[in-house]
Protein backbone atom coordinates (compact mmCIF):
# COMPACT_ATOMS: atom_id res chain seq x y z
CA UNK A 1 0.00 0.00 0.00
CA UNK A 2 2.98 2.35 -0.42
CA UNK A 3 2.13 5.71 -1.99
CA UNK A 4 4.80 5.23 -4.64
CA UNK A 5 6.47 2.04 -5.74
CA UNK A 6 4.15 -0.49 -4.10
CA UNK A 7 4.83 -4.11 -5.08
CA UNK A 8 1.20 -4.44 -6.16
CA UNK A 9 1.73 -1.94 -8.97
CA UNK A 10 4.70 -3.78 -10.42
CA UNK A 11 2.84 -7.08 -10.40
CA UNK A 12 -0.10 -5.34 -12.12
CA UNK A 13 2.18 -3.63 -14.66
CA UNK A 14 3.97 -6.88 -15.51
CA UNK A 15 0.68 -8.75 -15.88
CA UNK A 16 -0.76 -6.15 -18.27
CA UNK A 17 2.47 -5.95 -20.27
CA UNK A 18 2.57 -9.74 -20.62
CA UNK A 19 -1.02 -9.76 -21.86
CA UNK A 20 -1.05 -6.70 -24.11
CA UNK A 21 2.58 -6.13 -25.07
CA UNK A 22 2.17 -2.37 -24.59
CA UNK A 23 5.10 -0.34 -23.28
CA UNK A 24 3.30 2.09 -20.96
CA UNK A 25 0.70 0.93 -18.42
CA UNK A 26 -1.22 3.68 -16.61
CA UNK A 27 -3.67 2.58 -13.88
CA UNK A 28 -6.88 4.53 -13.27
CA UNK A 29 -9.73 4.19 -10.79
CA UNK A 30 -12.17 3.17 -13.56
CA UNK A 31 -12.26 2.62 -17.30
CA UNK A 32 -14.04 5.92 -17.93
CA UNK A 33 -11.13 7.74 -16.28
CA UNK A 34 -8.79 6.14 -18.82
CA UNK A 35 -11.14 7.34 -21.57
CA UNK A 36 -11.23 10.83 -20.08
CA UNK A 37 -7.43 11.08 -20.13
CA UNK A 38 -7.11 9.66 -23.66
CA UNK A 39 -9.72 11.94 -25.22
CA UNK A 40 -8.61 15.01 -23.30
CA UNK A 41 -5.29 14.59 -25.10
CA UNK A 42 -6.46 13.35 -28.51
CA UNK A 43 -10.00 14.71 -28.83
CA UNK A 44 -11.13 18.30 -29.33
CA UNK A 45 -13.36 20.41 -31.54
CA UNK A 46 -13.36 19.40 -35.19
CA UNK A 47 -12.10 15.87 -34.49
CA UNK A 48 -13.97 12.68 -35.41
CA UNK A 49 -13.41 9.37 -33.61
CA UNK A 50 -14.88 6.24 -35.23
CA UNK A 51 -15.62 2.94 -33.49
CA UNK A 52 -17.54 -0.22 -34.31
CA UNK A 53 -19.97 1.12 -31.67
CA UNK A 54 -19.06 3.48 -28.84
CA UNK A 55 -20.40 2.63 -25.40
CA UNK A 56 -22.02 5.45 -23.43
CA UNK A 57 -19.03 6.56 -21.34
CA UNK A 58 -16.74 6.44 -24.38
CA UNK A 59 -19.14 8.53 -26.42
CA UNK A 60 -19.64 10.97 -23.53
CA UNK A 61 -15.92 11.50 -22.97
CA UNK A 62 -15.37 12.07 -26.69
CA UNK A 63 -18.22 14.57 -26.90
CA UNK A 64 -17.15 16.40 -23.72
CA UNK A 65 -13.79 17.00 -25.42
CA UNK A 66 -15.61 18.65 -28.34
CA UNK A 67 -15.04 15.79 -30.79
CA UNK A 68 -17.70 13.75 -32.60
CA UNK A 69 -18.19 10.03 -31.91
CA UNK A 70 -19.10 8.01 -35.02
CA UNK A 71 -20.47 4.45 -34.94
CA UNK A 72 -19.70 2.15 -37.87
CA UNK A 73 -21.32 -1.23 -37.12
CA UNK A 74 -21.82 -3.84 -39.83
CA UNK A 75 -25.36 -3.90 -41.24
CA UNK A 76 -26.23 -7.29 -39.73
CA UNK A 77 -25.62 -5.85 -36.24
CA UNK A 78 -28.84 -3.87 -36.61
CA UNK A 79 -30.97 -6.97 -37.23
CA UNK A 80 -31.44 -8.68 -33.83
CA UNK A 81 -32.91 -11.89 -35.27
CA UNK A 82 -30.12 -12.49 -37.80
CA UNK A 83 -27.63 -15.17 -36.75
CA UNK A 84 -24.05 -14.34 -37.77
CA UNK A 85 -20.81 -15.22 -36.01
CA UNK A 86 -19.26 -11.74 -35.72
CA UNK A 87 -22.01 -9.13 -35.60
CA UNK A 88 -19.73 -6.91 -33.50
CA UNK A 89 -17.46 -6.18 -36.47
CA UNK A 90 -16.79 -2.72 -37.83
CA UNK A 91 -17.92 -1.82 -41.35
CA UNK A 92 -14.50 -1.60 -43.01
CA UNK A 93 -15.85 0.03 -46.18
CA UNK A 94 -17.55 2.75 -44.13
CA UNK A 95 -14.36 3.30 -42.13
CA UNK A 96 -12.27 3.69 -45.27
CA UNK A 97 -14.81 6.12 -46.69
CA UNK A 98 -14.66 8.19 -43.47
CA UNK A 99 -10.85 8.19 -43.45
CA UNK A 100 -10.77 9.44 -47.04
CA UNK A 101 -13.43 12.06 -46.38
CA UNK A 102 -12.01 13.50 -43.13
CA UNK A 103 -8.31 12.70 -43.43
CA UNK A 104 -5.80 11.96 -40.66
CA UNK A 105 -5.78 15.62 -39.59
CA UNK A 106 -9.37 15.25 -38.32
CA UNK A 107 -9.27 11.63 -37.10
CA UNK A 108 -6.83 11.42 -34.16
CA UNK A 109 -7.47 7.72 -33.55
CA UNK A 110 -9.76 4.82 -34.40
CA UNK A 111 -11.38 2.78 -31.61
CA UNK A 112 -12.61 -0.82 -31.60
CA UNK A 113 -14.79 -2.13 -28.75
CA UNK A 114 -14.38 -5.86 -27.96
CA UNK A 115 -16.85 -7.31 -27.41
CA UNK A 116 -19.29 -4.78 -28.86
CA UNK A 117 -21.37 -3.91 -25.79
CA UNK A 118 -23.78 -1.51 -27.48
CA UNK A 119 -24.50 -4.13 -30.16
CA UNK A 120 -25.55 -6.86 -27.72
CA UNK A 121 -22.09 -7.97 -26.64
CA UNK A 122 -21.36 -9.36 -30.10
CA UNK A 123 -17.76 -10.38 -30.84
CA UNK A 124 -15.29 -8.89 -33.28
CA UNK A 125 -13.32 -11.26 -35.50
CA UNK A 126 -9.54 -11.35 -35.60
CA UNK A 127 -9.77 -10.73 -39.33
CA UNK A 128 -11.71 -7.50 -38.75
CA UNK A 129 -9.26 -6.30 -36.09
CA UNK A 130 -6.37 -7.03 -38.45
CA UNK A 131 -7.97 -5.19 -41.39
CA UNK A 132 -8.80 -2.13 -39.29
CA UNK A 133 -5.22 -2.12 -38.00
CA UNK A 134 -3.81 -2.30 -41.54
CA UNK A 135 -6.08 0.52 -42.68
CA UNK A 136 -5.10 2.73 -39.73
CA UNK A 137 -1.40 2.13 -40.35
CA UNK A 138 -1.78 3.00 -44.02
CA UNK A 139 -3.20 6.38 -42.91
CA UNK A 140 -0.73 6.68 -39.97
CA UNK A 141 -3.66 6.93 -37.51
CA UNK A 142 -3.35 5.30 -34.06
CA UNK A 143 -5.61 2.32 -33.41
CA UNK A 144 -6.91 1.76 -29.86
CA UNK A 145 -8.95 -1.12 -28.46
CA UNK A 146 -11.63 -0.73 -25.80
CA UNK A 147 -10.59 -3.96 -24.13
CA UNK A 148 -13.26 -4.34 -21.43
CA UNK A 149 -14.18 -7.85 -22.57
CA UNK A 150 -11.05 -8.93 -24.41
CA UNK A 151 -11.11 -12.48 -22.98
CA UNK A 152 -14.71 -13.14 -23.98
CA UNK A 153 -13.92 -11.81 -27.46
CA UNK A 154 -10.88 -14.09 -27.69
CA UNK A 155 -13.08 -17.04 -26.66
CA UNK A 156 -15.48 -16.31 -29.53
CA UNK A 157 -12.55 -16.06 -31.94
CA UNK A 158 -11.30 -19.44 -30.70
CA UNK A 159 -14.68 -21.12 -31.07
CA UNK A 160 -16.02 -19.40 -34.20
CA UNK A 161 -13.16 -18.19 -36.42
CA UNK A 162 -11.56 -20.68 -38.84
CA UNK A 163 -8.02 -21.70 -37.92
CA UNK A 164 -8.22 -20.57 -34.28
CA UNK A 165 -9.65 -23.58 -32.43
CA UNK A 166 -6.27 -25.04 -31.49
CA UNK A 167 -4.93 -21.81 -29.99
CA UNK A 168 -5.23 -20.69 -26.38
CA UNK A 169 -7.44 -17.76 -25.40
CA UNK A 170 -4.42 -15.95 -23.96
CA UNK A 171 -2.45 -16.29 -27.21
CA UNK A 172 -5.43 -15.04 -29.20
CA UNK A 173 -5.83 -12.08 -26.84
CA UNK A 174 -2.15 -11.25 -27.23
CA UNK A 175 -2.54 -11.32 -31.01
CA UNK A 176 -5.56 -8.98 -30.79
CA UNK A 177 -3.53 -6.45 -28.81
CA UNK A 178 -0.55 -6.78 -31.17
CA UNK A 179 -2.57 -5.08 -33.92
CA UNK A 180 -3.27 -1.99 -31.78
CA UNK A 181 -1.26 1.01 -30.60
CA UNK A 182 -2.95 1.12 -27.22
CA UNK A 183 -6.07 0.31 -25.25
CA UNK A 184 -8.42 1.39 -22.50
CA UNK A 185 -9.98 -1.04 -20.05
CA UNK A 186 -12.47 -1.15 -17.21
CA UNK A 187 -11.48 -3.80 -14.67
CA UNK A 188 -15.08 -4.42 -13.63
CA UNK A 189 -15.50 -6.51 -16.78
CA UNK A 190 -12.76 -8.96 -17.75
CA UNK A 191 -10.52 -7.81 -14.91
CA UNK A 192 -12.90 -9.66 -12.56
CA UNK A 193 -12.60 -6.91 -9.95
CA UNK A 194 -14.87 -4.37 -8.26
CA UNK A 195 -12.97 -1.25 -9.28
CA UNK A 196 -10.12 -0.11 -11.50
CA UNK A 197 -9.10 0.47 -15.08
CA UNK A 198 -6.06 1.29 -17.15
CA UNK A 199 -4.79 3.12 -20.20
CA UNK A 200 -1.98 1.44 -22.14
CA UNK A 201 0.04 2.54 -25.16
CA UNK A 202 3.40 2.40 -26.91
CA UNK A 203 3.85 6.11 -27.73
CA UNK A 204 6.28 7.77 -25.27
CA UNK A 205 5.03 11.33 -25.80
CA UNK A 206 1.38 10.35 -25.42
CA UNK A 207 2.19 8.38 -22.26
CA UNK A 208 3.95 11.38 -20.70
CA UNK A 209 0.96 13.62 -21.39
CA UNK A 210 -1.36 10.97 -19.94
CA UNK A 211 0.69 10.66 -16.75
CA UNK A 212 0.68 14.44 -16.31
CA UNK A 213 -3.14 14.45 -16.38
CA UNK A 214 -3.26 11.32 -14.20
CA UNK A 215 -1.32 13.02 -11.40
CA UNK A 216 -3.69 16.00 -11.41
CA UNK A 217 -6.93 13.99 -11.57
CA UNK A 218 -6.36 10.39 -10.44
CA UNK A 219 -3.17 9.93 -8.45
CA UNK A 220 0.47 8.93 -8.72
CA UNK A 221 1.37 6.80 -11.77
CA UNK A 222 1.98 3.74 -9.58
CA UNK A 223 -1.54 3.63 -8.17
CA UNK A 224 -3.85 5.81 -10.30
CA UNK A 225 -6.46 6.27 -7.60
CA UNK A 226 -6.51 2.61 -6.53
CA UNK A 227 -5.57 0.94 -3.27
CA UNK A 228 -2.75 -1.57 -3.51
CA UNK A 229 -5.14 -4.43 -2.78
CA UNK A 230 -7.22 -3.46 -5.83
CA UNK A 231 -4.16 -3.45 -8.09
CA UNK A 232 -3.24 -6.88 -6.72
CA UNK A 233 -6.75 -8.20 -7.32
CA UNK A 234 -6.78 -6.68 -10.82
CA UNK A 235 -3.56 -8.48 -11.73
CA UNK A 236 -4.97 -11.75 -10.38
CA UNK A 237 -8.21 -11.25 -12.31
CA UNK A 238 -6.40 -10.67 -15.60
CA UNK A 239 -4.59 -13.97 -15.10
CA UNK A 240 -7.74 -15.90 -14.16
CA UNK A 241 -10.04 -14.49 -16.85
CA UNK A 242 -8.25 -16.33 -19.67
CA UNK A 243 -8.95 -19.68 -17.98
CA UNK A 244 -10.92 -21.58 -20.59
CA UNK A 245 -13.06 -23.57 -18.12
CA UNK A 246 -14.24 -20.28 -16.63
CA UNK A 247 -14.98 -18.80 -20.07
CA UNK A 248 -16.78 -21.92 -21.26
CA UNK A 249 -19.15 -21.80 -18.27
CA UNK A 250 -19.60 -18.04 -18.53
CA UNK A 251 -20.48 -18.02 -22.23
CA UNK A 252 -22.61 -21.16 -22.01
CA UNK A 253 -24.73 -19.61 -19.23
CA UNK A 254 -25.67 -16.73 -21.54
CA UNK A 255 -26.31 -19.07 -24.47
CA UNK A 256 -28.57 -21.22 -22.28
CA UNK A 257 -30.83 -18.29 -21.40
CA UNK A 258 -30.98 -17.04 -25.00
CA UNK A 259 -31.88 -20.52 -26.29
CA UNK A 260 -34.64 -20.98 -23.69
CA UNK A 261 -36.14 -17.54 -24.29
CA UNK A 262 -35.97 -17.93 -28.07
CA UNK A 263 -37.80 -21.26 -27.81
CA UNK A 264 -40.54 -19.48 -25.80
CA UNK A 265 -40.93 -16.91 -28.56
CA UNK A 266 -39.32 -14.09 -26.57
CA UNK A 267 -37.57 -11.62 -28.94
CA UNK A 268 -33.87 -11.87 -28.10
CA UNK A 269 -30.78 -10.62 -29.86
CA UNK A 270 -29.15 -13.57 -31.65
CA UNK A 271 -26.73 -15.21 -31.47
CA UNK A 272 -25.98 -14.98 -27.74
CA UNK A 273 -23.26 -12.50 -26.89
CA UNK A 274 -20.72 -12.95 -24.15
CA UNK A 275 -21.55 -11.00 -21.05
CA UNK A 276 -25.31 -10.53 -21.27
CA UNK A 277 -28.66 -11.51 -22.69
CA UNK A 278 -30.15 -8.71 -24.78
CA UNK A 279 -33.90 -8.47 -25.26
CA UNK A 280 -35.20 -6.80 -28.42
CA UNK A 281 -37.44 -4.19 -26.78
CA UNK A 282 -38.72 -2.87 -30.11
CA UNK A 283 -40.08 -6.33 -30.99
CA UNK A 284 -41.13 -7.00 -27.39
CA UNK A 285 -43.21 -3.79 -27.24
CA UNK A 286 -43.94 -2.85 -30.88
CA UNK A 287 -46.76 -0.51 -29.79
CA UNK A 288 -44.35 1.70 -27.79
CA UNK A 289 -42.56 4.22 -30.06
CA UNK A 290 -38.88 5.12 -29.38
CA UNK A 291 -39.71 8.57 -27.90
CA UNK A 292 -41.66 6.72 -25.19
CA UNK A 293 -38.66 4.49 -24.42
CA UNK A 294 -39.71 0.86 -24.96
CA UNK A 295 -36.47 -0.42 -23.43
CA UNK A 296 -37.01 1.48 -20.19
CA UNK A 297 -40.64 0.34 -20.05
CA UNK A 298 -39.53 -3.27 -20.47
CA UNK A 299 -36.80 -2.94 -17.83
CA UNK A 300 -39.39 -1.69 -15.33
CA UNK A 301 -41.79 -4.52 -16.24
CA UNK A 302 -39.08 -7.16 -15.70
CA UNK A 303 -38.40 -5.83 -12.23
CA UNK A 304 -42.09 -5.80 -11.32
CA UNK A 305 -42.69 -9.26 -12.77
CA UNK A 306 -39.64 -11.19 -11.59
CA UNK A 307 -37.47 -8.91 -9.48
CA UNK A 308 -34.91 -8.92 -12.29
CA UNK A 309 -32.66 -5.87 -12.53
CA UNK A 310 -31.68 -4.96 -16.06
CA UNK A 311 -30.33 -2.03 -18.05
CA UNK A 312 -31.87 -0.18 -20.97
CA UNK A 313 -29.56 0.05 -23.99
CA UNK A 314 -31.62 2.19 -26.32
CA UNK A 315 -33.02 5.68 -26.69
CA UNK A 316 -32.74 6.56 -22.99
CA UNK A 317 -29.01 5.88 -23.24
CA UNK A 318 -28.27 6.90 -26.83
CA UNK A 319 -31.25 8.89 -28.13
CA UNK A 320 -30.89 12.63 -28.56
CA UNK A 321 -32.96 15.67 -29.45
CA UNK A 322 -31.63 18.05 -32.09
CA UNK A 323 -31.28 21.40 -30.29
CA UNK A 324 -31.90 23.33 -33.50
CA UNK A 325 -35.02 21.54 -34.74
CA UNK A 326 -36.32 19.76 -31.64
CA UNK A 327 -36.44 16.53 -33.65
CA UNK A 328 -35.89 13.32 -31.66
CA UNK A 329 -33.23 10.94 -33.00
CA UNK A 330 -33.69 7.44 -31.53
CA UNK A 331 -30.94 4.93 -30.87
CA UNK A 332 -30.01 2.40 -33.57
CA UNK A 333 -31.41 -0.41 -31.40
CA UNK A 334 -33.92 -0.58 -28.54
CA UNK A 335 -32.66 -3.27 -26.18
CA UNK A 336 -32.66 -4.36 -22.56
CA UNK A 337 -29.45 -5.88 -21.22
CA UNK A 338 -29.43 -8.58 -18.57
CA UNK A 339 -25.79 -8.93 -17.50
CA UNK A 340 -25.16 -11.56 -14.81
CA UNK A 341 -22.29 -11.06 -12.36
CA UNK A 342 -19.29 -13.27 -13.01
CA UNK A 343 -19.04 -16.52 -11.03
CA UNK A 344 -21.79 -16.38 -8.35
CA UNK A 345 -24.74 -17.62 -10.43
CA UNK A 346 -25.74 -21.26 -10.98
CA UNK A 347 -28.10 -22.75 -13.54
CA UNK A 348 -31.02 -22.30 -11.12
CA UNK A 349 -30.40 -18.55 -11.21
CA UNK A 350 -30.44 -18.70 -15.02
CA UNK A 351 -33.74 -20.60 -14.89
CA UNK A 352 -35.21 -17.87 -12.68
CA UNK A 353 -34.21 -15.30 -15.30
CA UNK A 354 -35.90 -17.37 -18.01
CA UNK A 355 -39.09 -17.60 -15.95
CA UNK A 356 -39.10 -13.86 -15.22
CA UNK A 357 -38.40 -12.78 -18.79
CA UNK A 358 -40.72 -15.37 -20.31
CA UNK A 359 -43.48 -14.56 -17.82
CA UNK A 360 -43.29 -10.88 -18.66
CA UNK A 361 -43.60 -11.65 -22.37
CA UNK A 362 -46.53 -14.02 -21.81
CA UNK A 363 -48.50 -11.29 -20.01
CA UNK A 364 -48.37 -8.88 -22.95
CA UNK A 365 -51.65 -8.33 -24.75
What name fits each language-model region?
Residues 241, 317-365:
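PLP-dependent enzyme catalytic core of the Aspartate aminotransferase-like
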Residues 4-25, 29-266, 289-290:
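Conserved PLP-enzyme active-site core in the AAT-like
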Residues 207-208, 286-294, 343-352:
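Short, conserved charged micro-motifs
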Residues 211-214, 231-240, 275-285, 331-337:
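Short acidic (Asp/Glu) and glycine-rich catalytic loops that position anionic groups and cofactors
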Residues 282-310, 323-331:
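Active-site loop ensemble at the mouth of alpha/beta enzyme cores that anchors a bound cofactor
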Residues 254-255, 269-281:
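Conserved glycine-rich beta-strand-loop-beta hairpin in the small C-terminal domain of fold type I
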Residues 217-218, 306-308, 359-364:
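A common structural junction motif
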